[in-house]
Amino acid sequence: MSDSFYRYDVIVIGGGHAGTEAALASARTGARTLLLTHNIETVGAMSCNPAIGGIGKGHLVKEIDGLGGAMARAADLAGIQWRTLNASKGPAVRATRCQADRNLYRTAIRCIVEAQPNLTVFQAAVDDLIIHNGTSEADSVRGVITQTGLRFQAPSVVLTAGTFLAGKIHVGETQYAAGRMGDPPATTLAARLRERPFAIDRLKTGTPPRIDGRTLDYGVMAEQPGDDPLPVMSFMGQVSDHPRQVSCWITQTTEQTHEIIRNALHRSPLYSGQIEGIGPRYCPSIEDKVVRFAEKTSHQIFVEPEGLEVAEIYPNGISTSLPFDVQLALVRSIHGFANAHITRPGYAIEYDFFDPRGLKASLETKAVGGLFFAGQINGTTGYEEAAAQGLLAGLNAARHVQGLPAWSPRRDEAYLGVLVDDLITHGTTEPYRMFTSRAEYRLQLREDNADARLTGVGRAMGLVDDARWARFAAKQEAVQRETTRLSALWATPGNALGREVAGALGVTVSRETNVLDLIKRPELTYATLMRVPTLGPGVDDAQVAEQVEISVKYAGYLDRQRDDIARQQRHETTPIPEGFDYASVRGLSIEVQQKLERVRPQHIGQAQRIPGMTPAAISLLLVHLERARRSQVA
């Protein structure tokens, strides 16, 4: 093989949701990229629940899409049941979710990966990193060594190992090494990384048993059909992209279920001390739910199809690591599951993760230059959180090679910015999940405007191709054109438009009113106004109509939030030099110095969000930084 086969700009380790987005982002910027995976057949595999999106998560998927990523496009091609969550609430918290066909999703991701220029895929497990130990400068990564001894060289490496680092599966008293069920763990790589100056701990996650859907009684369950009209996930998508649609179903556990679980808790690795890692707070096992909510007589279970051409279903809500005989008993005690056949047991998996406070906002490690971490190894849970980190890490890995400054969005620019800032500032002791409640400026960070927030930035950095840019530009132009058209129309009590509005909508126009002001009325929407003959039919693009309505209806709130952001940003981006000596700042307490030394914030905004940081300490820091700046100028 030629020397060029072993040399790349960026190497990505792992072909999951973080790894594929990292490799694609790197390659889109022009960096020669190698994606290493232990099994090409599992690139893009959905290891746990067959779904994309949800509260907070759908926002991340839209942001990935706005930056040219793959997840939303694959979801549109694989989504077999679609819902808009919080549809009756404000636009800030509305979220798109789809039930996905596992095989269709994996196929879509693999096709996107294989079609991407500058991206090479190679099947190999990685056992070690090649790291140059600096003397006068920091250590830096130079490449990787595979299980078979192949050495691939690159000045940037992105590690996206998911649950594979020293992964250990638990089913009752049985435990064994695995990355996930059916896949070997990355044991050697985990051991090598533990020799490096990284803070490493253990987390755990779990998955429910899978069931043969043909053995269930759907007659005692509640059907949950998808939405009509169907939403789409990608700004490039259309409803015709979706495959055939199916329903999900809802059932409940019973008192018998809970009794079976309580009687077997002594055999649960969660309660015997066998599992040391902390699990996700917002996706607890059925054992946890029965113990923590002892007063509840039932827990809801969503019966979700795994795909169109397979019989398996995913019983969302009964993640468990109890012994198999207990799993079988508890499953058959659920309404409609009396004759259920389990096709795969549920299990818990423990794995290594790195304290994310050891990362820069670019997701580059502070300890080793050119080495980036993304996904579950940073303490997060969920496909969407992993994919968003992967895109950011892949982009910055490429920019590192290209000699360009790293990029990371602020908290007021993207949920991705909230995610990264939370991780690198606060760290985490349990798997981190994104919610809209984590964002201070969520009215700005809506699903519908993710492209308006990020596509221009993505285009400037090489992430957005010509087709997406043309679609985005056309959409923005249409929004502006329609807003301008409506702003030129006025209704008065006596003119024709005023009479039409009153007649068609039953709305009284008591004074001269601009049509845009009519949209601001709580009882009116863009769609209802378009029923007025002089105003309609309006635009036929639902995304354009939505943008027009939201930008007008919430204009006052948005303006106030922008003012809040401007005030907050006054010192947010003031940089703190790398290697800054906090002991040199007179007046800082030892406690504050230790907090700052531990996190090593890159700017004042990050320093402000360190738990226990006081306004007085920030003021002292700002004064010191300003003095240092003036002395350099002088």
Curated annotation (Swiss-Prot):
Ranges in coiled-coil conformation: none
Gene Ontology terms: biological process: tRNA methylation; tRNA wobble uridine modification
Primary location: cytoplasm
InterPro entries, per database record: FAD/NAD-bd_sf (IPR036188), GIDA_C_N (IPR049312), MnmG (IPR004416), MnmG-rel (IPR002218), MnmG-rel_CS (IPR020595), MnmG_C (IPR026904), MnmG_C_subdom (IPR047001), MnmG_C_subdom_sf (IPR044920)
GO molecular function, one term: flavin adenine dinucleotide binding
Binding positions (NAD(+)): 279-293
Compartments, as annotated in UniProt: Cytoplasm
Quaternary structure and interacting proteins, as annotated: Homodimer. Heterotetramer of two MnmE and two MnmG subunits.
Protein name: tRNA uridine 5-carboxymethylaminomethyl modification enzyme MnmG
